[in-house]
Every structure is written in structure tokens, then in C-alpha cells.
């Protein structure tokens, strides 16, 4: 039993994941890991085993990319690395600091904007996002949770983390075991995900004519 949060009332990890799984509304079947992935604001502050952290980055490493350019880079710090952790933490805006302060690991994804030959990589951000998704899904498989945060000071991250020109900070990620929402403020607790809401597929998937829903999802 790993990552057992107190708010699950001592359910097993599998039962806890099933409880979250039941919150999603999927008219068509998808993999359980995709159903179970979520972005919490409550983290348990216990450390993540190093082998699990290595597994996250190995998953990210195997993401697809244009011409196998692999533009993603990750800065990572655990709470044991106090100065490094604070360097990343201090880049977060106040609201995200309040939700991420218990997370034992912080990461910053960064995209290399050009190929090794110096030519621009127009898909660097897309490919870095795919690597992050691999990482997040792997975290779910290991009983961890990950919250991606766009609210951070990009210029401060560039300076404090010595990110060179030609690289773009993309997203900050807090990773940990699920925590107890009762330890949060009322405001943050109210923001914890309840029933995830997604637009219907008819609004997202078109035929080869813009905004004409694909015949896969047309009614009648």
C-alpha cells in the first residue's frame, strides 16, 4: 500500500484510484491511467523514492518528438536539496506556492527552441508537452500525483536557474503522494477537483471542414 492519503478513510491505493476514476464521465472507453490522472492541490510531504523519480524521467525520455529532436529538459529539486528547492519554489506565484508547499518534489520543464544544427524547432513546445504528459501518466501509475502550474515567474526562472538563451521555460510541476485536503485553507480545499468537466467531442473533433463535427460523433 503506497501513497495512502488519510482522506481516503484507509482504503487501499487501488480503491482510492477507483474512487477518483468514478468521478469521470467517459462515453467511450479509455485507459484507466488516463481516467485516474488528476491535478490535486493537496500533497503528502513524505519523500518520493528515488527509483520512482528516475522512472518518471525515463517515461518522459521516451516521448515522441519531431525528427527525434528531444527538445525537453527538466530542472528538478527535492526538499532535501533545500537551496535548489527554494530556487524553484520562489519562482511560483503566491497562489501556487500555497498549494505546492507540501509537495516533496518540484520540477520545471524547459524546451530547447532549436535543433542541434541551430535551425528553429517549431514543435519544441508541443514535444515538451508530450514528454510532460508521459511523466504525469507514469506518476499516476506509481501512485503519485502531479500538478502542472503555468503560474510562475518565467524571467525569474531564467535568471535564478541560469537557463540559457534558446531555451523556454514551459511549466512548473509539483509531484508527491496524495495529501489531506483538510490541511489546506478553505479556499484551496474548495478548489480541489470534484467532477472533472470536459467539452463534448462534437465541439472538439471536426471533419475536414472547420466546426463541422466529425461523422463519428454526429447525432442522427
Model-derived features: positions:
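Acidic, surface-exposed loops and disordered segments
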Residues: 2-220
